[in-house]
């Protein structure tokens, strides 16, 4: 006796037969699970999967391939239960990865063994990734899967540059089965003195580290052998970003609030040296030049700690002797110009505060647009305007004439790239301006790109990058018809 019933698979109904004498299925059925059989003649039959089937994550796939293009690649390992390409929920753009579930567990293991890091798809720089999804790795079947590559891949440094791959293999094969051994070489083909060694298990890699790290010094090497786990791709990307941030004075989180002060102090010290060298050529030290140099030194020292320095006040005025000329004094770009800095009140003795910036012969740019001011303007927003050279016309007159006034800057209208190429960035420090933003995203083209591929590359590298106590959030700007730009 057979009872007609409906079963659900992925939310769709399908007719099945259940035998009353146990678990039965009709001959030639496509598959069975818990006694449910499917009629092969029904074109709408939903395939069934094993109860212990593995959900695979597929990475490094071209963004122009969808499910129907990927299906032939994976079908050779078994019947596919579900294949889904991941897309951005706002833009619908391909993320370059997918989830795959086979009907049978063995098919997933075969596909992982045959494809993971073994084949590079057209248009990609790295081999395809086929591994259990995160949800699967937390299950109880992890013992049947291969350990992640980063848990068993070693970096070996301080090798003899004359050693070959075979020499390195002989050194490491005593600790386990070696799957890969690659010596890093330069464009000329010569060894760089380092290599990557991949074992078949994490325990073997750990044993090699314990036995060989620092154990000997190879001939021609400057220090003992280095054996450690290789960095992951994410760690390498983060290190590159931190190096780039360090060049901009942002490596230390505490340096961010005072980055503008540090740049100001550094430029002051550089100009102090140039000023002193210039006046030294004349054999006579102008009292005002000496005062300006000392004042710059004081401000630079205090500003290195993020503090605003009170300028020293000269005890007497002075004029420049006829034999002293000023054209040799170089100028400092706009970060040292007044640019809207406001500043210190008059001194107690009644004399106005001398201006360190004008010791360099640079006038404020009255025609400059406030929007074009650099981030230093925000850093010194609470300081009153200096009295400037009006207090000491004789001291500053010759230097001021040596530098013509720059033409007024015309504000430029903000430009945007085409649709799908504009990024919106959260959690930027308040001290950041256009210049800092440009430096951070310069390796990727710019914040507004001219093609979606560059925008996606920037998102992958910079999303989650930590600056100070916050992490950047980088995503595509929403379409213009959306309610919000982010």
Swiss-Prot record:
Cell compartments where the protein resides: Nucleus; Cytoplasm
RRM domain ranges (all copies): 54-135, 152-232, 404-479
Gene Ontology cellular-component annotations: cytoplasm; nucleoplasm; nucleus; postsynapse; ribonucleoprotein complex
Tissue expression pattern: Ubiquitous. Strongly expressed in the cerebellum, hippocampus, amygdala, temporal and frontal cortex and frontal lobes.
A matching Pfam family: RRM_1
CDD domains: RRM1_CELF3_4_5_6 (cd12632), RRM2_CELF3_4_5_6 (cd12635)
GO molecular function list: BRE binding; mRNA binding; mRNA regulatory element binding translation repressor activity; pre-mRNA binding
Chain residue ranges for the region called Sufficient for RNA-binding and MSE-dependent splicing activity: 1-298
Gene3D superfamilies membership: 3.30.70.330
Family per similarity comment: Belongs to the CELF/BRUNOL family.
Protein name per the record: CUGBP Elav-like family member 4
Source organism: Homo sapiens
Gene that encodes it: CELF4
